[in-house]
């Protein structure tokens, strides 16, 4: 009997190990090679599959090399920010094949194909290649199918234009505080002063999202921002070791810190939400901040169709990740580009003076700023907050002339498309806001060639929030200062989650 039990145990162990080996081989070798053969037969050009790591190690090494030194302010930023996708474009054409680990990734630049990918949200779903990124927050941008539709429906009221108009006074309050700080710095030096505007802009946009999202709980909100910023840095460090199997599970100092910071964020958010729910139960009027509107909208859902506390916590994290990061990088690149193009800075200031004079900017006036809108669109074209979007296919799909098997990813290289001479003309790399004088449709020739906030049904729900906040900030800055690049300015666009200035943005501010 003892021998029989040992034999059975051994046999089971062999079966389990064999199954594990087979699954691993299938994931690492057989499935990728099968997908590669299918794509090659259709004439798709690209790199050959390297077991497990694909092109990932090369991508990282090229990125590290490209970002090891700054560039001139007039240089094309693409070789620094997206060296590997740019090389693939030059070598293998506008539709090409790369490998993110064992996952084949097809880059497309054709506007009609991009439009199809954006429109078919149930077929081309969000890619979840890097599990550790979930620690920063999931929420609306990472959901698919019915859950995405449910969350979009609940969150929509918080970003309705009428609700955003009610937040303009918060935009003004936070932006005025920053301008006041800069004014004091300049006054202490006389009439001009060198200022790294990047830290101030990140702090200001964090203050805006803290106040608009959490109202009276904005101080706790500031702590969330600090932790989210730290987490983003730690995730990027871990991302560079992604090709090492199991690295994210090792008890490294960075990995341990990530888990601790993530837990602290969860605890703060749970406390804020629970406090709001207790206040509502005791009969207090709902707050008009984003969280208050979200809670009220969620309350109006039928049984089983609302969000859990955990769901709301993820959406609150997303308020920070998407709302704060997007606006701060839009503002910093706007100031950098207007420092280089004094004629457009003067035109923007003249428009602000015509609309507001020296008075406080209001919603109605902000919506009249045509030159400012043109400038912001051009900044978003040349320096999109997110330089690349990905989608995943889970079943066989047709896309143009290609038949794509399930298991393939689609890459939408925002930065490459935005600077593509075939779509935007030979001056695609130049700062020319006049492209947008007749609106987006005319500028893009009704093609999907401009998508800094994505496009279609999944277009960023907070884009109006971002643009209105940016207009408020730039109006106040232009009323008080002129600015130019400082001699110590170092041009080094760098991407972790969003495209930001690696060494800050040192400008000379001149008091008007």
Swiss-Prot record:
<feature type="binding site" description="axial binding residue">
    <location>
        <position position="460"/>
    </location>
    <ligand>
        <name>heme</name>
    </ligand>
</feature>
<dbReference type="GO" id="GO:0016020">
    <property type="term" value="C:membrane"/>
</dbReference>
<dbReference type="GO" id="GO:0016705">
    <property type="term" value="F:oxidoreductase activity, acting on paired donors, with incorporation or reduction of molecular oxygen"/>
</dbReference>
<keyword id="KW-0349">Heme</keyword>
<keyword id="KW-0812">Transmembrane</keyword>
<dbReference type="GO" id="GO:0005506">
    <property type="term" value="F:iron ion binding"/>
</dbReference>
<dbReference type="Pfam" id="PF00067">
    <property type="entry name" value="p450"/>
</dbReference>
<protein>
    <recommendedName>
        <fullName>Cytochrome P450 72A14</fullName>
        <ecNumber>1.14.-.-</ecNumber>
    </recommendedName>
</protein>
<dbReference type="InterPro" id="IPR002401">
    <property type="entry name" value="Cyt_P450_E_grp-I"/>
</dbReference>
<dbReference type="GO" id="GO:0004497">
    <property type="term" value="F:monooxygenase activity"/>
</dbReference>
<dbReference type="InterPro" id="IPR001128">
    <property type="entry name" value="Cyt_P450"/>
</dbReference>
<feature type="transmembrane region" description="Helical">
    <location>
        <begin position="2"/>
        <end position="22"/>
    </location>
</feature>
<keyword id="KW-0408">Iron</keyword>
<dbReference type="GO" id="GO:0020037">
    <property type="term" value="F:heme binding"/>
</dbReference>
<keyword id="KW-0503">Monooxygenase</keyword>
<keyword id="KW-0560">Oxidoreductase</keyword>
<keyword id="KW-0479">Metal-binding</keyword>
<dbReference type="InterPro" id="IPR050665">
    <property type="entry name" value="Cytochrome_P450_Monooxygen"/>
</dbReference>
<keyword id="KW-1133">Transmembrane helix</keyword>
<keyword id="KW-0472">Membrane</keyword>
<dbReference type="InterPro" id="IPR036396">
    <property type="entry name" value="Cyt_P450_sf"/>
</dbReference>
<comment type="similarity">
    <text>Belongs to the cytochrome P450 family.</text>
</comment>
